[in-house]
Amino acid sequence: ILKDYGKDVTIPEPEGYDPKEFACACANPVCITPKEPDRVWSKEMMITYGKLPNHKYMINWPIEGNDYYINLIEMSPEERGKALEYAKHYTMCFVYFLQHELGYNTLGLADDEYPTEDKLPFIPYHRESRRIHGLVRFNLNHALNPYTQDEKLYRTCIAVGDYPVDHHHTRYHGYEELPNLYFHPIPSYGLPLGTLIPKDVDGLIVAEKSISVSNIINGTTRLQPVVLQIGQAAGALAALAVKNNQKIDEVSVRDVQNAILDAKGYLLPYLDVPVTDVKFASYQRIGSTGILKGEGKNVDWSNQTWLRADTVLLASELDGLFDVYPASKDEWKKTGTEKLSIAEAVQLVRKIADRKS
C-alpha cells in the first residue's frame, strides 16, 4: 500500500534495478514494445486503479507491474525464503519505477498500514495454489451454462462470484506459448459445496484457492469476495458435522445452505433480488432447486445473473418445475410465451401438494 506524503519520498535506487522490467506498465516515453499492446493504460488510470481512502493506493498491477512468478511448492523452506525476499525486492524496484520514472515521488510505502519492519504485507498474495480432487470439480462450463451441464451443481451452491476470469501470466517464463485468457467473459455464478470436500480424505474441509476447480475458472474463484464466502461455508459445514455427529460428506447441502441464508449470505447471484428483499431467502431456495432459473449475461466488465423476479412468469419458464415434479407436466397445457396468472400458479401448486400428500 502506497501513501501520498505530500513531499518527495523517493527511495534509493534498488540494487540491480532495470527500468525495462516495468517500461510498459503504462503509457510513457520508455514504453516501446509492450507485451500486451491492447492493454496499455495511462499512468493516471494505472495509479488510480487501486485508489483507497486517506490518500492511499493499492499497488497490484498485472500489466508489466509488480506481479512476480514463483513456484514455491517445489522449493525447500530455505529456497522459499530467498525467493520471497527477491519478490519483495522486485516490488521495491516497481515502487522506485513509479517514483523515479513516472514522477510519483510523493508516493511511498504507507507507514501506518502494516506493522512490519519493511512496511510490506505480512504474507504475499498468491493467485494460485495446489488444488484438491473434490467430490465435484467446478469448471468454466458450469459458470457459462449452469443449466445445460450433466451435473446440476447450481442446486448445491454456497457462495457467489461475479469477477471475470482473470489470469496474470506475462511474468511467467514462456507465457507467449500460453492461450490468451484475458478476461474471458462469463456471467456471475454460484460455487458448489462439493468443491470444498476432498474426494478421498475424511474429516477435511478445504478453502481459499485450494478448492476443487479447474485452472481456468480459478481465475475468478480466487477473488477475495469469493474466498471469504468459502470460509463462511466451510465453517457452517464443520459446525453442522460436529453438531449432528456426521462425517463431512454426510452433512445435508440444504442444511449448509439454510445456515448461509440465515446469515444473509448468497447461494445464487441474482441482481434483482438483493439481500434486503423480503423474498430474498425464498427466491434463493427456489433457484437452488432449479424450479426457476436465473438468466446470466456478460456486459463489459460486469458479470450478471437476473431472476426476472418482477416480470410475469411465462409457461416456458416452468420447465424447471417439471424436472422436480414431472407428473405435473401432463396436466399443464400452456406453452412458450403464454403468461401464467396467479390463479393458475396457485392451482398448479395445489395439485402438486395434493399429489405429494
Spans of features found by a protein language model:
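Structured segments of extracytoplasmic/periplasmic soluble domains
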Residues: 1, 97-101, 241-244, 259-266, ...
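Flavin (FAD/FMN)-binding glycine-rich loop and adjacent Rossmann-like elements that form
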Residues: 1-259
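Short, flexible coil/linker elements and helix-boundary hinge sites characteristic
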Residues: 6, 16, 29, 103, ...
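Generic serine detector
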Residues: 42, 76, 129, 188, ...
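Long, well-structured alpha-helical subdomains associated
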Residues: 250-282
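Extracytoplasmic Gram-positive cell-surface binding/anchoring modules and repeats
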Residues: 269-320, 324-355
